[in-house]
Amino acid sequence: MQTEHVILLNAQGVPTGTLEKYAAHTADTRLHLAFSSWLFNAKGQLLVTRRALSKKAWPGVWTNSVCGHPQLGESNEDAVIRRCRYELGVEITPPESIYPDFRYRATDPSGIVENEVCPVFAARTTSALQINDDEVMDYQWCDLADVLHGIDATPWAFSPWMVMQATNREARKRLSAFTQLK
């Protein structure tokens, strides 16, 4: 895969430039654009993934299905599709926005900061997973209710962005709609 960049943003969320992704994530990470996606299978189960130990930020942490950064000129939806193919080896339904104005800042135990405007999406797949070990070290298909209960009971066991997304009432409601079989 070619070198990825992040789209830098000012405080109002307006693009101001780009920076190589690996260089962008430091102890003083500048605000940038990202996305987060929750993927459901034909049984209405959520894919929860564990980040590879080689990841710069939050290695080995359990999180929602896929996260990433849209590239210059790429829509958020196309970025979700691209990363689902790259990380999970799956085709997905068109991503649906579930939390369009999500923004967060969090620091991992090593001091690496995430500072993102991060629209959240959900999608479905019927494809068999073909996991990219450079991105994902483990995964589990779970009932959403069980995951939400786990987040409520032990938020420290999940990525901070997953916890913040899952505790938003409207996002939780929209995620629940994806558990209904179609």
UniProtKB/Swiss-Prot annotation:
Catalytic activity: isopentenyl diphosphate = dimethylallyl diphosphate
Protein EC: 5.3.3.2
Sample GO molecular function, one term: zinc ion binding
One annotated Gene Ontology cellular component of this protein: cytoplasm
Cofactor(s) the record lists: Mg(2+); Mn(2+)
Cell location: Cytoplasm
Annotated site location: Essential for catalytic activity: Y104
Record: residues binding substrate: K21, R51, K55, H69, R83, E87
Domain Nudix hydrolase: 30-164
Cofactor note: Binds 1 Mg(2+) ion per subunit. The magnesium ion binds only when substrate is bound. Binds 1 Mn(2+) ion per subunit.
Keywords assigned: Cytoplasm, Isomerase, Isoprene biosynthesis, Magnesium, Manganese, Metal-binding
Pathway: Isoprenoid biosynthesis; dimethylallyl diphosphate biosynthesis; dimethylallyl diphosphate from isopentenyl diphosphate: step 1/1
Source species, domain of life: Bacteria
Positions with a binding annotation for Mg(2+): C67, E87
UniProt: Mn(2+) binding residues: H25, H32, H69, E114, E116
Record note on quaternary structure: Homodimer.
Name listed for the protein in its UniProt record: Isopentenyl-diphosphate Delta-isomerase
Provenance organism: Escherichia coli (strain K12)
Originating gene: idi
